């Protein structure tokens, strides 16, 4: 089944008849990053590579499908395998798959991602929010250009933008209490192309993340308010464009407990850990908003184990020794959900 042009869904129906349905999801898209030279598994496509581990996710889900297929006659219920496109591109392929109806009849969903944890370690986040929202605002500042020697004759959009950036950096620390995660990161500042010209315009791009919809709405409102008020003080104007990306991934408490129990049953004791989530974002949230879900972190190797590069680095790669651990936990979660309600 192809719910979208670049995603796939495979279905395995158990030999013991109908029952519950669980979906296992792997994101499969690459990144616009030139992979580092010298890697034995280097991308053959110029400027594009799997430096976030999504190729590993696809391989593990295929392995899980093969394993569960061999156990088909012992399974009651259905397993769906989601090979999802466009996780890296807001608002994300998961939402498109949900819109296409892939969750019809699905009772639960499991996601997994390789990170820089010890090889084969399964980390379960015990708090509901395992990932954050991911949103952005672009502010175009309209000043009035002038000669670099006569700033009084214009409205300097660079100065306006600089004050905006400084003010935006105070939004979290002066409005949200410690322990309530949020981050506002101005990441783009573009202006001018000549050293003796104060330009007409400048552009600021802001990325911001949090773990609650309440704080998400607050950040949208406050970033815009800061931009408009700072511009007004200097006699500038602004155009503001916001993009609402993926929501925070909120796990189901019962699925968290199930994952903890299953991991302890099928993994070595030193290969199970707990955590409090991460500050990055994941469009798996689109599935988690609709059905009870859990999102697992799988260790692909640490610097001490010879894997010093984090996800999105041109030389990132997980140790293939983690693949069997990923297959084991995915298959075990599926079997446990179907056979031990």
Give the predicted meaning of each segment:
Residues 159-341:
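Metal-dependent amide/peptide-bond hydrolase catalytic core
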Residues 10, 24, 54, 81, ...:
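Divalent metal-coordination and catalytic microenvironments
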Residues 1-18:
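A non-catalytic alpha/beta surface segment that caps or lines the substrate-entry region
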Residues 20-23, 78:
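Residues that mark the start of a beta-strand
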Residues 1-4, 50-56, 277:
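Active-site nucleophile and cofactor-binding loops and adjacent substrate-binding regions
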Residues 23-25, 137-139, 295-300:
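Non-cysteine beta-strand/loop elements that form the S-adenosyl-L-methionine
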Residues 12, 141-143, 208:
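Hydrophobic beta-strand positions in extracellular immunoglobulin-like domains
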Residues 31-49, 55-56, 61-62, 68, ...:
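Histidine/acidic-residue-rich, glycine-tolerant segments that coordinate divalent metal ions
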């Amino acid at each position: 089944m192809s719910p979208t042009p670049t995603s796939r869904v495979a279905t395995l129906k158990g030999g013991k008849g109908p029952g519950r349905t669980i979906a296992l999801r792997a994101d499969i898209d690459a990144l616009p990053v030139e992979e580092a030279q010298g890697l034995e598994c280097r991308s053959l496509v110029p400027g594009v590579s799997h430096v976030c581990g999504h190729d590993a996710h696809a391989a593990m889900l295929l392995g899980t499908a093969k394993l569960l297929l061999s156990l088909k006659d012992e399974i009651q219920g259905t397993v769906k395998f989601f090979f999802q496109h466009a996780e890296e591109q807001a608002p994300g392929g998961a939402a498109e798959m949900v819109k296409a109806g892939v969750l019809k009849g699905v009772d639960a969903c499991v996601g997994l991602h390789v990170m820089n944890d010890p090889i084969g370690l399964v980390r379960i986040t015990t708090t509901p929010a395992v990932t954050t929202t991911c949103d952005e605002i672009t502010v175009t500042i309209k000043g009035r250009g002038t000669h670099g020697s006569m700033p009084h004759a214009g409205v300097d959009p660079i100065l306006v933008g600089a004050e905006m950036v400084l003010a935006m950096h105070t939004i979290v620390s002066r409005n949200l209490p410690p322990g309530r995660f949020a981050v506002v990161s101005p990441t783009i500042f573009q202006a001018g192309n000549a050293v003796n010209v104060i330009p007409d315009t400048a552009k600021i791009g802001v990325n911001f993340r949090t773990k609650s919809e309440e704080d998400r709405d607050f950040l949208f409102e406050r970033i815009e308010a800061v931009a408009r008020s700072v511009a007004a003080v200097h006699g500038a104007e602004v155009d503001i464009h916001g993009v609402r990306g993926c929501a925070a991934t909120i796990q189901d408490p019962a699925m968290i407990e199930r994952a903890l129990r299953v991991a302890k049953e099928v993994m070595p004791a030193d290969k199970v850990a707990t955590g409090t989530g991460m500050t990055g974002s994941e469009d798996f949230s689109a599935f988690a908003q609709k059905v009870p879900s859990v999102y697992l972190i799988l260790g692909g190797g640490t610097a001490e184990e010879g894997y010093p590069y984090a996800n999105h680095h041109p030389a990132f790669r997980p140790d293939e020794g983690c693949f069997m651990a990923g297959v084991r936990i995915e298959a075990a979660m599926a079997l446990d959900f179907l056979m031990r309600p």
